[in-house]
A protein has these predicted regions:
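Hydrophobic alpha-helical membrane segments
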Residues: 1-281
Length: 281
């Protein structure tokens, strides 16, 4: 029987013993790319209106950079899990493992995204059919579309989306160990089934912990953004709002990166504990 308290204690031990290695990986793969993307976004968008430079190839560059940042984030998460799974793993070994398993992780993520898209088709069809303009979805057109469909279709859409959210929460819990499985077991599509088996009996615990961590993360991020933003604005003045936004984003990125390290370390140790219990049983 896996106890979450024991797993959390192991997680704390991992973060205390391997803090420097975890921090260096997070800084290079999570924090720095995110800050660079934010700087580029501020260069393209001033006070909410796209600048002339953003109308051409610059937006394509930003989109490409966003893809690179997303890939680096996946790479960083895999490397963090590799470090947190085995105390003998070095930084170089963790990075090599992450690089080797990155295509699998991206492929499974795309496969999951495709499945989610397919599940979203039924409620989208009646809304799209009632859209006044086939191209360009806006809040106003969405409102017109929802008013234009029948009561039965609205009820179906609302009920479907409610069930969809519940299913997504359940799936998120059952797939919480997917990345640790990808890193440690060298499997492909079978990683989905393996994650389901390892998370059996832990679903509600994982959901509860995820909700708790989500609340804590939201509070930390909002508090950091508000307090740091005010401090930087007082120091730099109202004439440097772009720099204030960039520095605030950099500090907030530190908080989000730290929270990611905590979660990756936890799921890695949860995987280790569950695998040990499974092997013993």
């Amino acid at each position: 029987m896996v106890k979450m308290g024991t797993v959390w204690d192991r997680t704390v031990d991992v973060m205390n013993g391997r803090a420097a290695m975890l921090a260096s990986i997070a800084a290079l793969t999570l924090w720095l790319p995110g800050v660079v993307r934010q700087a580029l976004a501020l260069a393209f968008v001033g006070n909410g209106t796209a600048t002339p430079a953003a109308s051409g190839g610059a937006l394509g560059l930003y989109f490409l950079l966003s893809l690179v940042v997303a890939v680096l984030a996946i790479f960083g998460q895999l490397a963090l899990i590799a470090v947190a799974s085995d105390p003998a793993t070095t930084r170089g070994e963790a990075c090599r493992t992450a690089a080797a398993r990155l295509p699998v992780a991206i492929g499974l993520a795309l496969l999951f995204a495709l499945a989610v898209f397919v599940l979203l088709v039924p409620p989208i069809v009646p809304i799209a059919a009632a859209m006044p303009h086939p191209v360009g979805m806006t809040p106003q057109s969405m409102g017109v579309a929802m008013a234009g469909i029948g009561a039965g279709a609205r009820a179906f859409t609302g009920l479907y989306m409610l069930v969809f959210v519940v299913v997504m929460i359940w799936l998120a819990a059952r797939l919480a160990l997917l990345n640790p499985v990808i890193v440690n077991e060298r499997d492909g599509v079978g990683s989905f089934a393996r994650s389901f088996r390892l998370s059996r009996g832990l679903t509600w615990k994982i959901i509860g912990l995820t909700i708790l961590l989500g609340i804590v993360s939201a509070v930390v991020i909002l508090a950091t953004q508000s307090v740091v933003g005010i401090i930087f604005r007082l120091i730099l003045g109202a004439d440097n709002l772009g720099l204030v936004a960039l520095l605030t984003a950099a500090v907030v990125a530190v908080a989000t990166s730290a929270l990611t390290v905590v979660w990756m370390s936890f799921v890695a140790q949860l995987y280790v504990a569950r695998r040990e219990a499974s092997d013993a049983g």
